[in-house]
Design a protein with these regions (language model features):
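ABC ATPase NBD coupling module
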Residues: 69-82, 181
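Conserved ABC transporter NBD signature motif
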Residues: 61-71
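Conserved ABC ATPase "signature" region
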Residues: 113-128
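A short, flexible loop at the N-terminus of ABC-type nucleotide-binding domains that lies
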Residues: 1-5, 10-24
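Catalytic Walker B motif of ABC-type/P-loop ATPase nucleotide-binding domains
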Residues: 157-160
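Conserved ABC ATPase signature
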Residues: 132-136, 140
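Helix-to-loop junction immediately C-terminal to a conserved catalytic motif
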Residues: 53
Length: 208
């Protein structure tokens, strides 16, 4: 059950010819847990998340969720996946709260106000809840994106450099919270920060 990659190969066409990002990749992820994905830039870490999210379907092999190909699962991205992007993907003219509510509304999820308040306090954004996102710093926007993903209770959360704009204190706080949250879901984090390894027994390292 859970998420599984079977003989997955991803290639890109370049001016020089065809470039293989990874070939015959086989991974059977646990149903829950925090998994760090590290490695040099350009080795396929973010590409792997794009494939798992169903955003890139140009690959060979199979990606399965609960033994069903993700392409065959109705509303897979809506019901199964929450994605935290490097560039946040927030709506600037909406408030912190409305960004969270709108994202969950798109996924058909009713937000529990108490849960939202708890997350706002954990990530120290409770005093900015009605601020428009365009007025926030990069680190604050990153925390809003994290809250939004966690609110939706998706079984899989994909994070592409989710702590890049955070200072060291908030970075460690996010890692600790993700470790706790991963007791109920699978969280995959692409990161250049090797310190994440101490928060998880699972570690995938990509080499070019």
């Amino acid at each position: 059950m859970g998420l599984e990659l079977k003989n997955v190969t991803k290639k890109f066409k370049t001016i020089e010819g065809e470039r293989v990002i990874f070939e015959n990749l086989n991974i059977h992820f646990p149903d829950y847990g925090l998994i760090a994905i590290t490695g040099e830039s350009g080795c396929g870490k973010s590409t792997l998340l794009q494939l798992i999210a169903g955003l890139d379907q140009d690959y060979e092999g199979k990606i399965l969720f609960n033994q069903v190909k993700i392409e065959d699962i109705k509303d897979y991205r809506q019901l199964v996946i929450s994605f935290v992007y490097q560039n946040y993907q927030l709506i600037d003219y909406l408030s912190v709260k409305d960004n969270c509510l709108f994202y969950c509304h798109l996924k058909g999820i009713k937000v529990v106000e108490k849960q939202l308040q708890e997350l706002l306090e954990i990530f120290e954004l409770n005093e900015l809840v009605n601020q428009k996102v365009k007025n926030l710093s990069g680190g604050q926007k990153q925390r809003v994106a994290l809250i939004r993903a966690l609110l939706c209770s998706s079984p899989i959360i994909l994070c592409d450099e989710p702590t890049g704009a955070l200072d060291e204190i908030n970075r460690q706080k996010v890692y600790r919270f993700f470790k706790k949250a991963s007791q109920r879901r699978l969280i995959l984090i692409v990161s250049h920060d090797q310190k994440i390894s101490k928060y998880t027994p699972y570690h995938l390292n990509f080499e070019c």
